Every structure is written in C-alpha cells, then in structure tokens.
Amino acid sequence: MVVLRDFWRHRRVLLTGHTGFKGAWAARWLHRLGAQVYGFALPPETEPSLHALLKTPLAGEMLADLRDANAVSAAMAAAQPEIVLHFAAQALVPASYRDPVGNWTSNVLGTIHLLEAMRHHARPLTAVIVTTDKVYANNESGAAFPESAPLGGDDPYSASKAATEIAVHSWVKSFFAGRHKVGTARAGNVIGGGDWSADRLIPDIVRAAQRQDSVVLRRPEATRPWQHVLDPVHGYLRYAEALHAGKTGLSERLNFGPLEDQRITVGTIATDLTRAFGAPAWRHEPQQEIGEKGVLALDARLAQQSLSWQPRFTTQGALAATVAWYRDWMSGAEAAVLTDRQIAAFEDGL
C-alpha cells in the first residue's frame, strides 16, 4: 500500500469518465492517494449518481463529449497530465443496439480524439486505455480468453471496443514509440455500490427491490466474470505504475478478471440478491433482438504474473460488499463514508 501511495501522491492524472460508476470509484481512490485528478466526462447520466453523491474534490473538471476533439485537446492542455486513465465510453450492450452510430463514434472516434491529444502533447505520457472483456471473438466454448485470443464482436458494443483496441495499437506503433507508454486493460461485469446504470443486473435488482417489483432477466443462464469494482481499478493503477516505470517485457494489453473458479450465472446472482434485498423473485423475458453472448470468461494470469496483482474478492465477497453498500445507503448512510470505508478495507489488505 505504501508503494501505491508513494507513486500517486501529487501525480497529475487525466481521468476520463469520472462521472460514471467505475470512474467515480477511481476518482475517489486517486484522491485518497493524493493524486491531482482532472476529470473529463459527460454529465452524470443517472439519478442518483455516485459522482454527485461522493463530491470528490478534483483539481479540475470538464463536462464535455469525447467526440468534441477541441474539448479533448483543451482538457489535455489544462490538465498537463503525467498519467491518462481512459474510462469514458458507451458501455452497455442494449444501448449499442438502440444507437449503434452513437456507440461507435463515442467509443472509437472518442478514443481517437484522446490519442490525438496525446500525440500532440509536449511531455511524455503514460496511459491505460480501459476497454472490455467483450473484445474477443466469442464462440461461447466456455474457455477463458487470454490476451492473445483473436479480437471480434458480433454486437455493436463489442465490435466498437475491439475496434478501439486496434486503433490504440495503431497509434502506439505509428506515433508513440519511444515517447508515450500505453496499455489497454480488459475487464468487465464490474459490480459494487453506487451503480445506477440502466440495463445492468445489480442496479436493476436494487430498483426492483425499491419498487417491490420483479426484476426481468434476459439470459438467466449466462455466466460472466463478475468482480468488485476495486479489483480492476487496483489493476489499472498497478498497470499504470508498471508502464510508467518502463517494466521490461510488460504486455501492451492485460486482462483483469476473477479467478476461473468464480463463474456464477446471472440467475444465481439474481436469486441471491433478490433475497438479500427482500425483493420479489425474478422473472425471465427473453429479448431476441439483444444478441448478448451466454458464456464469457477471462484468463487474467498474465496480469497476476507481471503486476503481482490478484483479485481480492471472491464473487460472493464482491456481492456481499455490494449488498452492504446499497443497504447502508438506503438506510441513510452517506455514500462517501461507505465508499471510503470499503476502499480503506481494501487498502488494508494490500
């Protein structure tokens, strides 16, 4: 933990997507570590929003769209970062079907605008570009994907994030060699307190419990690499440190996911959480137009070996921490207190 704090103290960080769920947790942790965090993102899209509840102090903030190249360049100039953490994205599969063009321009063109701002930045940069576990060509064999697996994507979201990976690789090889240090981080199905996004399992269950209604599941048999938000965020920070230090042999792409024996179906999680929140039993309503894969798993051994990173939460532990956060918040506890408490407990184990 001392090493983590020593690295990030007073470090200038441009964090995109800081108003989102995962970005809000990252901003909070970076602030606790003493970093100077500059946020760039759209205004929060949910009510409530974790970003608004936490009120994390920032060194600077710009609420704008990644598709606005001038705004991205202005944010880079204002922040003068040493580290870039790129979280901002359209991150939902169902939303990518409703607006595929917006999904692609946000995820691919938006990232290219960031890469271009980095290309024209005067000082060397270290950047972690966060994509998703869904970048792989998924034949639903059940095998966990290593970083060397082919990229693909049948749905608009997955395809856009695979294309983002290709764009990052191109900019690194064409423009950044010997100057900027960049890696892509692949993780997904992140859970934790303070997520109110639409079309996500845990927030849907929380909302259903508040209404005393049944949550609707599209694919209860699907399995996902569920992980508590602090595990991948810890991985991203470790990755940025290693990239910045120029660690020999470090891969330019890393998976961050739970241990392979932690696979649990959507239906099992929904059953456990509806009971925990006292909500009615879930019901199944297939939506054929949403082409989500039923089986998805990541092989995160490379991150474990190269960064000495390990997921600290089991899936059940991640669920318990998530339930505790929402329960306490619904009972009147402050979001900042709950979030700081869970970050501190996580830090104590490092």
Predicted regions, residues:
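C-terminal substrate-binding subdomain of Rossmann-fold SDR/epimerase-dehydratase oxidoreductases
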Residues: 32-33, 64, 209-350
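Residue-level detector of flexible, active-site-proximal loop/helix-junction positions
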Residues: 44, 68, 134, 189, ...
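N-terminal Rossmann-like NAD(P)+-binding domain of SDR-like oxidoreductases, especially those catalyzing
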Residues: 1-187, 345-346
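NAD(P)-dependent short-chain dehydrogenase/reductase
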Residues: 139-144, 148, 156, 162-247, ...
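Residues within well-ordered alpha-helices
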Residues: 26, 50, 204, 299-300
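Residues in well-ordered alpha-helical elements
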Residues: 69-70, 82, 94, 101, ...
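Short, solvent-exposed loop/helix junctions and linker helices
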Residues: 16, 66, 105-108, 157, ...
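Residue-level signature of the cytosolic catalytic core of signaling kinases
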Residues: 46, 54, 194-198, 262, ...
